Amino acid sequence: MLRIATGVRAARLWSALVGLASLLALGGQASAQTEQQDVVNAAETTFSNFMRDPDMTWLQRHLSSAKAVLIAPQVVKAGWILGGSGGRAVLFARNEQTGRWEGPAFYNLATASVGFQAGIAVSETVTLVTTEKGLNSLLATSAKLGGDASIAAGPVGAGANADITTDFVAFSRSKGIYGGVNLDGTVISVADGWNHAYYGRPVLPTDILLTAHAHNPQADRLAEALSRAASTNTSMR
């Protein structure tokens, strides 16, 4: 009975978390396309914040060699004994021939946890996808970080320098009562409905990220910011 009750509580908590994350991330907008563009615009702000942060030099130096970058402008983490986190993210993949960043493909992030925890935190995260295995895992319907692909927290500090061989390297900035988001164990799933709404037709992540058969000019500014940052920071490595 205790196990059943705990499961029910976890399900209810997770439903509340997802609802809270959606409200925060979407800003209560009624238009689906406006909702997606809001996330793209917020992702651009997040990316700019990380590129200006003197503690994110490892991220800045290694952006140019990444296969892709996953930007989550708002990940909500909350809990009381049972907890979890959730949010929306956009993924851009780097075309190795042209250097252009193709995207965005929209994804959902979800994590559940059990253990002593209390409070709420809101984070913005930028995750480098450093291997083909990591990128391929995101082209599937869903992937579990730390399971289907390896992940490490990125080095932070003005002089941070480390050799990391995981498929994903995650960086986060948080504000809240307790610690920031740990993406290990996070399930990343393709937001098919959001991709459909943003591009006006059913599309797969491969259509958006690899073949460039889907394009929305409203995301060009973020794609260009990625290209500029990667080009500018190549000499830092």
Kindly give the residue locations of the regions a language model identified.
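N-terminal secretory signal peptides that target proteins for export/translocation
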Residues: M1-A10
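Hydrophobic alpha-helical segments, especially transmembrane helices
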Residues: A10-L13, Q74
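Bacterial N-terminal signal peptides
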Residues: W14-A25
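Sec/Tat signal peptide C-region and signal peptidase I cleavage site
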Residues: L26-A32
